[in-house]
């Protein structure tokens, strides 16, 4: 019934596409206007449109049809490619700030040019986001010819552009291509800069995200982090690892309804959620081994955390599946692409736990200096759009998190690929034997085959079997991806057999010739279902581009993780009832539906996880926005810093009276004026006779102290030129703000790590986190204000010449910039992307400056930040 109704009325997507198609006719009629024009005439016509939008005379909507028509005509002349009508629909979907779902080979790169050209008319910049440097360089170069013809400048941000001036030049272009991590890290670095002119990014106007599902869904659990070393006890990791090895893995025992849950062993592994649950027996054993009474008490939170990570390292994370050991290092394997993510480290001590497990050198844990998730970074843009071949399965998440609707664009030519039912075997061995038999069948007639695997381990197993059968083949996994694009490009040639993990080169088309078409096209064999239907669809989509012939089929076994964890018993029962013998398989739509149901369960779990991360990051995001906004004000020479200092000074005086226990409404005879005078001497180095404050009301005391501070401050500042005064005030304020913000981020990390334990007390961890983080933030703001006033009050100048003055200012600037450069060495990701080469931005330094929490080199026994590193006296400028 539902199907027949849909045939008559169509789906909502059909109706949306139909409405766009009606608008395409308005573009097509303009072809006869622009086609006869010379190149110069076409460029003049376009410039007139561009100027009308930039000046505000017309809106982008007013010129959309003409812009699209001119872009198509220019593309025909420059690239030799004419946009299809369905590509025009895709361009309008992107312009409207939505996601265009387009099948492999439908020309997404060309579609993007329509929306890019139109939106670049505002002069505010357009960012095109790709998944790797190769695609950013390729697309900016190929499409750049079209943009240049229309008078636009094109930039490309890649990891090899190291200097700020070079990166700024790329961002200043009308259109900029780059990877998601380059854009994100530049944003974080910009908000650590000490001069406004050093910032490289412009405003976040409009972005088109290519492979949007990979970046906004798969990597949404991936906070971009700039970090620095922290002072943590490295012995915790080895100790936790030793204890984890003594703990025995148990399991839940089935009990009758109403009976208490029973378990064996010291801990249970929850494979669905990838967590460890300690049993009562295990808790007691761990407490005995750690020699503590309560492992979950606040003072032992670090021990319980490290033990949990050590147990995860030994029981959940697998070598050659989740990570590899190379050159005495743990290197993460990206779960979605299969690539080695060199330079990326797990956070919260998990990476150190894996290092302890594998017996490699345990590297120092890091402290967060700046952080943002992709979710919150991309929500900075005034308008966001995306394109991919697979988005409908995550349409709800795109809508709820990013406000993006997914519109499926029809193919220009109908898809001819045959997608066959899954074949399900009892065991892994039977399945792999069947895959090899099928490969031999295809290979014997020359039909190319692409075999998709979910891990390095599985691709190596297939590789060994094919080698044994003497079938020539290419293998592409995290251990061998240098020639990735070339191997994938050639996977459609006659007789080619290619084994690839999920990395199978997105953005690189597999083309086939007429001979291969006559053999049936490219055959896709999946060796197991991925947790996400999208990844399976991406593998299928490698075949059948632009109406080519092709086929796809998945080979599964009850040993596969997805079936074993999510619903394998149900399928096993079906197989037992059918009496499936060894080597036989089930080819059933019922079973295929059961597999898809299991995938939906996992997808929902991942969605909840991403939503959970966003809920926590939203709390930090409000704080980050407030600090960054104020920081930007401090960088602006036009900002009235004197008014801010005056406002903060009043708060400082109020705080000082409170410290002296003098409050409004108290009888003045109860005022401890001796304590107040002592505080003023200690904090501000001003000698005051306590009798000076005798018999004064609170308001009078505030006015007197404020006047004293103002007089001293103005007398000191009067020797400076207004511009120098402004710069010194801004730089010193930054010198207070930045370290305080970094310490706050560390406190937030500690809070987040332990907040889950509040659930044991029947409290909602998220609510608790919001309350505690708000308290931390209000304390931070208070500390920044008070510390800034104190530093500015205590600063003394002993310049003998303008040159010495400028040298002293430059000295502080360089120190702040050195901290930023140092931090740039420590870019990392919590769970999912390749970090940059840490040597790139390495500053040239002499003697290494002590970190804030290091012991002071003067030998006082105090921490550096509480001794010679205080925001107080400095040679030349501060005394």
UniProtKB/Swiss-Prot annotation:
Keyword match Lipid biosynthesis: no
Residues annotated for ATP binding in this entry: 87, 105-109, 509
Subcellular location field: Cell inner membrane; Cytoplasm
Topology with respect to the bilayer: Peripheral membrane protein
Annotated positions binding Zn(2+): 856, 858, 867-868
Catalytic reaction annotation: ATP + H2O + cellular proteinSide 1 = ADP + phosphate + cellular proteinSide 2
Superkingdom of origin: Bacteria
Pfam family, one: P-loop_SecA
Cofactor binding annotation: May bind 1 zinc ion per subunit.
Enzyme class: translocase
Region feature (Disordered): 834-879
InterPro entries reported for this sequence: Helicase_ATP-bd (IPR014001), Helicase_C-like (IPR001650), P-loop_NTPase (IPR027417), SEC_C_motif (IPR004027), SecA (IPR000185), SecA_DEAD (IPR011115), SecA_motor_DEAD (IPR014018), SecA_preprotein_X-link_dom (IPR011130)
Cofactor(s) listed: Zn(2+)
GO terms assigned for molecular function: ATP binding; metal ion binding; protein-exporting ATPase activity
Gene Ontology terms: cellular component: cell envelope Sec protein transport complex; cytosol; plasma membrane
GO BP terms: intracellular protein transmembrane transport; protein import; protein targeting; protein transport by the Sec complex
EC number assigned by the record: 7.4.2.8
Known partners and oligomeric status: Monomer and homodimer. Part of the essential Sec protein translocation apparatus which comprises SecA, SecYEG and auxiliary proteins SecDF-YajC and YidC.
Function: Part of the Sec protein translocase complex. Interacts with the SecYEG preprotein conducting channel. Has a central role in coupling the hydrolysis of ATP to the transfer of proteins into and across the cell membrane, serving as an ATP-driven molecular motor driving the stepwise translocation of polypeptide chains across the membrane.
Entry's family note: Belongs to the SecA family.
PANTHER family, sorted: CHLOROPLAST PROTEIN-TRANSPORTING ATPASE (PTHR30612:SF0), SECA INNER MEMBRANE COMPONENT OF SEC PROTEIN SECRETION SYSTEM (PTHR30612)
Record protein name field: Protein translocase subunit SecA
Organism in which the protein naturally occurs: Sulfurovum sp. (strain NBC37-1)
Higher taxonomy: Bacteria, Pseudomonadati, Campylobacterota, Epsilonproteobacteria, Campylobacterales
